[in-house]
């Protein structure tokens, strides 16, 4: 944004030099990249009048001019411009003047035998145009009392100005305007702000006219003013100079006014030729519609290009025909020209995301789209429109016929709570309440003290006492800051900017502190080490995924692409894809694990719409003896894969159980008959199983691939509660083993049987293991024969047969009590 200091001084008084102002603005967040002192472009250039212009005696293309510079004797100047003639008021560079635009220092010199005492300048030589056809001509009716001959010509050229080229952060759309920067300067200097006077527009609805807004989110507000009887022509010099300082060229008085309002208020406007709009509409009822493009539509924009429109292109449509890219660029067919007598002035609000997509779909970026993409202030729409109408009537004449409006803007009010204690906690500085009550009102915020603490803010420390530290304000956000000031922390940032970041002292810790990892990070690293210890390689995947047809996935509101339109709900799908990729590349089976976050919609009872959890996932399987001439190929079986997971949990200190899951808890990625829930300490923490055969077939994977996924939160919570691991010495006494066999129903799980055996056998039982399963001849229908080996051992003595038999009999009794089993031994 280019800021004219001459224009800025009309809005707010300040005594800072350009360099001091640039430093002050930089410190409050508006970095000044360049200071352009336009005064140096024409220092020494004065106003002159050509009294006579005679042909040069020795050159056909030169003229010898006598120029009145306000002194007793006219100056003789040799000029080569074809438009040099008597009576012209012109800029004259006197001897000693340096013109940076052409890197020329003026001196008296003979030109073809005639002494020339200066140079009559063109705008190109003054740096105001790229190329000029002749010398510049000031208006013949110039007030010579206000600007006598020989006086400084820079005010007449708009070169009595300094321009600051500054950048603002993306959230400060209000700063892309002169009024926005003037507010900042007023706050910095504590001087009052002088806004341009605006006469509120009073107009009736446009007769026999329709306005249609297809999507109120894409266009929350639209206003159009019909003005008849305008006379399009050149703009006055003051308007041209303001546009030139901002890097814009003058078009005509109507278009220049719309550009001036864009610079002054940050509100883009567009003027349509009303008669041309009616021609486009034909015999249809005059209708302006705001909608997205349809297939096959085209538009010839003001830059002369005929553009094929895309579904993302947001349009202004007249009678069904596109006439402008909304918020980006107008159409050539309805542009304002010297023949225009009636205009339709558009002032609207367009959604930032919609405008960005629309502009990018056509490869365009304009001053208007740049502002819409950041978010034009809701509150300035009516002010900017009325100011534009006022200037058009003043500079181009005409009268207002009518006004059409559509307005679904959100409420232009917001109230926040600000706690002094929170401000001090964030900034680390003892700030007085008086400082807050001086700085925030200077930025336009209204404050009133209260004692209630903001409910959405973190609670105050228990040690905090009432009084100054407990001071709380209710803050009303000005309408022009609604887009970027939404929370208490935003108010703290606003205070810090104006208070001055350079005023905060550097405070070193009073005592040296040893850095350490958090308990959660320490335990997570321990889990990583254990997983690497069982032979798995850690992998990472992006949390984004395609939404596809899965309604349970949490969707991204503004996705980068369809491939990244949702966030993952599990780690296992990504691990399967990683296994497939490595398998396809000939890298062999991937044995890997991943620790990452997963996301899901929260249950209706939860106050939050979404929930996030950290999971541990893994994938393993394939041939255990690849390319080994000594052994035959041997795929990993279910028990080997399960054993690796069990050993990992045991190294972490957990005794795990694997129980059948109900259908609703099963994963569709796993074999329905070869998956189980993982339980520790009475809670289900995840699942384990073999990949579904259909999935392996679709992805051309080996059948023997296994996956698991575990919720880390219960694991970490349990690990964090534990103290030091207590070592139990090995028993030096011999063990006694007993076998037990029985018929059991097929639906009875081994895990449930083992659980009852351990409870019945008591502390003497060291281990229990299934060593035989048989189905077939001799076994009752619907049952199977199971055989378990129980090992008994005491830490302090050799067990007697009586003790072992007593425990074994208790096991038999409890099995018959809990299950419909038939004992065989």
From Swiss-Prot:
Q: What is its EC number?
A: 6.1.1.20
Q: What is its main location?
A: cytoplasm
Cofactor binding, note field: Binds 2 magnesium ions per tetramer.
Q: What molecular functions are annotated in GO for this chain?
A: ATP binding; magnesium ion binding; phenylalanine-tRNA ligase activity; tRNA binding
Q: Which residues does the annotation say bind Mg(2+)? A: 484, 490, 493-494
Keyword entries, A-Z: Aminoacyl-tRNA synthetase, ATP-binding, Cytoplasm, Ligase, Magnesium, Metal-binding, Nucleotide-binding, Protein biosynthesis, RNA-binding, tRNA-binding
Q: Which residues form the tRNA-binding domain?
A: 39-154
InterPro entries linked to this entry: aa-tRNA-synth_II/BPL/LPL, B3/B4_tRNA-bd, DNA-bd_dom_put_sf, Fdx_antiC-bd, Fdx_antiC-bd_sf, NA-bd_OB-fold, Phe-tRNA-ligase_IIc_bsu, Phe-tRNA-ligase_IIc_bsu_bact
Q: Which CDD domains does the annotation name? A: PheRS_beta_core (cd00769), tRNA_bind_bactPheRS (cd02796)
> How does this protein assemble?
Tetramer of two alpha and two beta subunits.
- Please give the name of this protein: Phenylalanine--tRNA ligase beta subunit
Protein source organism: Synechococcus sp. (strain JA-3-3Ab)
Q: What is the name of the gene encoding this protein?
A: pheT
